[in-house]
Amino acid sequence: MTITVAVDAMGGDVGLKVTVPASIQFLQDHPDTHLILVGDQPALEAELALHDGAVRERILIQHATQVVGMDEAPQLALKNKKDSSMRVAINLVKEGKAQAAVSAGNTGALMATARFVLKTIPGIDRPAIAKLLPNVKGTSCVLDLGANVDCTPEQLLQFGIMGSELMACLQGKANPSVGLLNIGSEDIKGNDNIKKTAELLRQSELHFYGNVEGDDICKGTTDVVVCDGFTGNVALKTAEGLAHMFAVFLREEFGRSWWTRLCALAALPVLALFKKRIDPRRYNGASLLGLRGIVVKSHGSADVTGFRYALAQACEEAGSDVIAHIADRVAKQLDNLKQSEAEAN
């Protein structure tokens, strides 16, 4: 199956200096994939000329005259940047010319544009930002990571459904466990919103584990962790900060003396494996779940390797037909709710 991915080639902190080489490397590893690079055509052609032309036949250029700034207000970008590389890339998904879009651009503008152009899946109130994160057992999906600061219990249930289907499609989990992020594992903990959400999750067909705490994300207690965007974003940024602090401490301790530097030299093979295991670039790429099309957000400061992983995730989501799986699961949940309400009346 040939998959075509639309790339916002101008988005991110560096733009085409990252997106173009990343696209070249990605195509070298994925012979059945095509890319549409969206952006300033002369600039893209000049950058492509600097790289290996063997995969050039699988690259199309779609000219776009505008670029969304990283600090631009989402609503202004939506109103005034209708020919931006971001908007055109998402339009290609809507038109069926691409099966997914990837952008390292402004997160708020990307969410607003994607929601406006693609619309949400029937039964989904709001899209959520979902990310696959490493844990001691493997990988888990955490959502929402910042799209929705305040969420109703019904919306959090929808997040649970979407996260469960994403893990089933991308990680092969037959019946992913779902945890609700809370201040404690006991049922009595949390505010009324959390308690209501827990009740809805218990009544659903999901494999609901129960409440989980922040450390359970790293422990891999559940395959999916559901939370509102405020809590999720704080948890994500805290984890990123801790990983950076740990790396700094490690460098400082290994560099204290000739003896510790010698120990570091001896430990290089193990350190290399450790670094690879927690390398944030391998987990670059957050899915905008709940839309009628696949959109993956790369970190704005991602390097070539990181952006390549975001492209790979978009390709994997397109190949697994995750949108259809989410739509089917949500439709079944809505039918069950209607049936329960009818029986209650």
UniProtKB/Swiss-Prot annotation:
GO terms for cellular component: cytoplasm. Keywords: Cytoplasm, Lipid biosynthesis, Lipid metabolism, Phospholipid biosynthesis, Phospholipid metabolism, Transferase. Pfam families: FA_synthesis. It is found in: Cytoplasm. It catalyses: a fatty acyl-[ACP] + phosphate = an acyl phosphate + holo-[ACP]. GO terms for molecular function: phosphate:acyl-[acyl carrier protein] acyltransferase activity. The keyword Methyltransferase does not apply. The keyword Iron does not apply. It comes from the Bacteria. Pathway: Lipid metabolism; phospholipid metabolism. Its EC number is 2.3.1.274. GO terms for biological process: fatty acid biosynthetic process; phospholipid biosynthetic process. Catalyzes the reversible formation of acyl-phosphate (acyl-PO(4)) from acyl-[acyl-carrier-protein] (acyl-ACP). This enzyme utilizes acyl-ACP as fatty acyl donor, but not acyl-CoA. Belongs to the PlsX family. Homodimer. Probably interacts with PlsY. This is Phosphate acyltransferase.
